[in-house]
Regions:
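FAD-site-proximal beta/loop scaffold in flavoenzymes
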Residues: 113, 121-148, 255-328
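Internal hydrophobic alpha-helix adjacent to the cofactor/substrate pocket in enzyme cavities
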Residues: 324-351
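C-terminal auxiliary extensions adjacent to catalytic cores
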Residues: 367-428
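Flavin (FAD/FMN) cofactor-binding core of flavoprotein oxidoreductases
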Residues: 349-366
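FAD-binding core/adjacent interface of flavoenzyme oxidoreductases
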Residues: 3-4, 73-168, 172-181, 249, ...
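A Rossmann-like FAD-binding core segment of flavoenzymes
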Residues: 30-34, 75-88, 99, 174-285, ...
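Beta1-alpha1 glycine-rich phosphate/pyrophosphate-binding loop at the start
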Residues: 5-75, 158-202, 419, 427-428
């Protein structure tokens, strides 16, 4: 009847899975909830650095979706979206089928813009931990490094916005190479567009600058900041170091045996260049309530939303979207969609708080920037073994959540408590 709405969630990552479970729980049975992914499985992206060094097998962080979704009353389609036709409330799928919706939640994550640097990425000469398949390939390359040690370059491309995993991978790699007693045979270099170590796209958080610099010194890692990677060849990286005004200062060429570089992100092709829906890089424009101002039946959550950079940097960088932000965007979207279905206006805002756990294998760094965009009332970072343990717990919890259709927000409940406890310890 007229009271039934069809809600489609586009993207089956951390945001999309959480979104369908919350919607299914919050909305009456008369409403239809559909999940569209671009494959038949979910992968837990935060664990990809562990896959790259062999601490996890890809299968351990993947979950098959079709049976699960039908078990929980959610329709599933794994064919992926070729194009969104927002004016017709319709998704054109990769198999030419069409899927119509009353409401759409876009949770696609990013398109990985490897093509912006010649030779970058899994089809070029560097590794990636952005997808689990990439991380599995990186593991093969890592094994070659172990068999025949040589220089390593880790870092991020210009316009990158997600730096945490680059630091994670650098330090996890260092930890694993020490375990294998070959760290002394390997020069490690970190190449980043950040204006300083620990900027993280957030203009630093608490003491991340000195904390991460000292971590690098302790681990004998060289670094170049304000670095713009221009080209990658087989075993050789070209990058330009700029000064604070952004003018070229020095050209560098570095040889490598193994390299993992995080690419810049863009919006996925399916939404590119839809006027009023996306910004020029394809990220979804949203209001305070996660809703697109032009297409009022479209919401967006996660890495695909447009948020402004925290500050201008000599080489353009973006601000990260962390697990805590994604979780709070999902919760706000569920509430606001439910309001619309009841004829009310959206009124819940997601919290733009950067809370990140960066695991270094033996230790780690947690940081909290509340709100993410300064001026901040909380700006705190801490280093310790507890971060590694918290990250392992988050992985276990989330994979369980996916399999059991749980909806409790983990950061809200567990991580924030843990951080509260750590902050209390430090203030005593």
């Amino acid at each position: 009847g007229e009271d039934m709405a069809k809600i489609v969630v586009m993207g089956a990552g951390i945001g999309g899975i959480s979104q369908v479970y919350e919607l299914r729980k919050a909305l009456g049975k008369e409403h239809e909830v559909v999940l569209v992914g671009d494959s038949d499985h979910f992968e837990f992206t935060p664990s990809n650095p562990w896959v790259a060094v062999g601490w996890r097998k890809a299968e351990q962080i993947k979950v098959d979706l079709p049976e699960l979704m039908s078990k929980y009353g959610i329709e599933f389609n794994g064919n992926g979206v070729r194009r969104l036709h927002a004016d017709d409330n319709r998704l054109e799928l990769n198999d030419d089928a069409s899927l119509t919706y009353d409401y759409l939640v876009i949770a696609t994550g990013p398109k990985l813009a490897f093509n912006e640097v010649n030779g970058l990425g899994p089809d070029g000469y560097t590794q990636s931990v952005c997808k689990t398949g990439h991380a599995a390939t990186a593991n093969l390359d890592f094994n070659k490094l172990v068999a025949d040690p040589g220089p390593v370059i880790v870092g991020a491309a210009p316009m990158a916005s997600c730096f945490g995993p680059a630091y994670e991978y650098l330090f996890i790699l260092d930890t694993e190479l020490k375990k294998r007693k070959i760290r002394d045979k390997i020069e490690m270099h970190f190449v980043t567009p950040e204006p300083y170590i620990g900027h993280l796209g957030l203009d630093g958080v608490g003491d991340t600058k000195s904390m991460l610099e000292s971590e690098m010194r302790d681990r004998h890692v060289h670094w170049t900041t304000n670095a713009k990677i221009t080209k990658v060849e087989d075993g050789k990286m070209h990058f330009t170091e700029v000064d604070d005004s952004g003018a070229d200062k020095k050209q560098h060429e570095l040889e490598f045996k193994h390299s993992m570089i995080l690419p810049a992100f863009k919006g996925v092709d399916a939404v590119m260049d839809i006027e009023g829906l996306t910004n020029p890089r394809g990220f979804i424009l949203i209001d305070d309530f996660q809703r697109n101002p032009k297409y009022q039946n479209i919401f967006a959550v996660g890495v695909c939303v447009a948020i402004p950079p925290v500050n201008a940097t000599p080489i353009a960088t973006g601000a990260p979207k962390t697990g805590y932000m994604i979780e709070s965007m999902v919760t706000a979207t569920t509430h606001n969609l439910a309001n619309l279905l009841q004829g009310k206006e959206p009124d819940e805002r997601g919290s733009w708080n950067a809370v990140c756990l960066a695991d270094f294998g033996d230790t780690g760094v947690a940081f909290v920037a509340l709100p993410q965009i300064p001026p901040r009332n909380t700006n705190w970072a801490s280093r310790g073994k507890w971060v590694h343990l918290a990250k392992v717990a988050y992985e276990k919890y989330f994979l369980h959540k996916v399999r059991a259709a749980k909806t409790e927000p983990y950061y809200e409940k567990t991580i924030m408590k843990l951080i509260g406890v750590e902050r209390l310890k430090e203030s005593r």
